[in-house]
């Protein structure tokens, strides 16, 4: 960017034309399969409770809100889309903006394009197959490999993530020169994520996409716990060429259980000195009314386009990243 006037887009126009073609191809993919495109709000009075996500806040001062109403930019369209599912929408997808007040860099921008879709009556494996179909169509790549979270740790770190004690996880961290972080970290899931990021991610999905599934139940988020093994959740992630592309679940349909998870998130936030975020009670009401058994996935479109174009960074495929927005 140092050689380019700051008003100009960071991405070449040729790349933006290719990006538009990919967006059209994604829409054709879902149209051919009878999946309805929907649009949901980018602002809400409630937000995520996940301790790892930081939402943007804004204030509405219009009619009925003279004192100001706090609104949150959506980190994902998930909550509103589930309300549509509970209302009987059938299979749905959305291509839209999401916002996270976190990183900016090679693979991150605080404003980004998300593809999210939900399939009633699909289990996790059937949705994984559909994600694989989409990736093969857009990226012209080979069919993905699949590994359970446990298998990935055993293969690359020689440790069982479902049974290892924190002391054992720290021993592995020491071999990866991560003791300066791991020795003071008390949260087991944070230790696992550290080991996964450094010891597993760089070695999967090199030549074809890799699906990692059955994450620990403690990392279930909005996913169902497996009925076959209560130690794991019906959750998967997709990696390709060192990039995390997607995160999917067999969706939790129990409103009471979801509320308990949100409340536990907020307790964990309080322990870390983070603000306790407002829980989306409209989502809870929708779940209690009846969310159909379904699976859903969120996929980063900017990263997908980056891979399709063999680009080096997101700024090569989005017109105006945050530094010149």
Swiss-Prot record:
It holds the Pfam family tRNA-synt_2. ATP binds at residues 100-102, 109, 244-245, 300. One of its GO terms (molecular function) is ATP binding. InterPro entries: Aa-tRNA-synt_II, aa-tRNA-synth_II, aa-tRNA-synth_II/BPL/LPL, EpmA, Lys-tRNA-synth_II_C. SUPFAM superfamilies: Class II aaRS and biotin synthetases. Gene3D superfamilies: Bira Bifunctional Protein, Domain 2. Keywords: ATP-binding, Ligase, Nucleotide-binding. Homodimer. Belongs to the class-II aminoacyl-tRNA synthetase family. EpmA subfamily. This is Elongation factor P--(R)-beta-lysine ligase. It comes from Yersinia pestis. The gene is epmA.
């Amino acid at each position: 960017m140092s050689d380019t006037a700051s008003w100009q887009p960071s991405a070449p126009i040729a790349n933006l034309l290719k990006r538009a073609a990919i967006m059209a191809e994604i829409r054709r993919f879902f149209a051919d399969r009878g999946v309805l495109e929907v649009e949901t709000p980018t602002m809400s009075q409630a937000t995520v409770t996940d301790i790892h996500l930081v939402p943007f806040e804004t204030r509405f001062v219009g009619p009925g809100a003279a004192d100001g109403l706090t609104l949150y930019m959506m980190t994902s369209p998930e909550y509103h889309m589930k309300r549509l599912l509970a209302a009987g929408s059938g299979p749905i997808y959305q291509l839209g903006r999401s916002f996270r007040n976190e990183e900016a860099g090679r693979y991150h921008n605080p404003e980004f394009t998300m593809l999210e879709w939900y399939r009633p009556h699909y289990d996790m494996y059937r949705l994984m197959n559909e994600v694989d179909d989409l990736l093969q169509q857009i990226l012209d790549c080979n069919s993905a490999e699949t590994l359970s979270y446990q298998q990935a740790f055993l293969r690359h770190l020689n440790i069982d993530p479902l049974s290892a004690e924190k002391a054992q996880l720290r021993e592995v961290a020491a071999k990866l020169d991560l003791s300066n972080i791991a020795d003071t970290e008390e949260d087991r899931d944070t230790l696992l994520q550290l080991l996964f990021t450094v010891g597993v991610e760089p070695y999967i999905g090199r030549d074809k996409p890799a699906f990692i599934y059955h994450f620990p139940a403690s990392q279930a988020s909005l996913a169902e716990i497996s009925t076959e093994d209560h130690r794991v959740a019906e959750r998967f992630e997709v990696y390709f060429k060192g990039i995390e592309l997607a995160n999917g679940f067999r969706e939790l349909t129990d409103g009471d259980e979801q509320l308990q998870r949100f409340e536990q998130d907020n307790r964990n936030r309080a322990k870390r000195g983070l603000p306790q975020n407002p829980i989306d009670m409209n989502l809870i009401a929708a779940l209690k009314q009846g969310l159909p058994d379904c699976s859903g996935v969120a996929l980063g479109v900017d990263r997908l386009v980056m891979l399709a174009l063999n680009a080096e960074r997101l700024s090569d495929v989005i017109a105006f990243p945050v530094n010149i927005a």
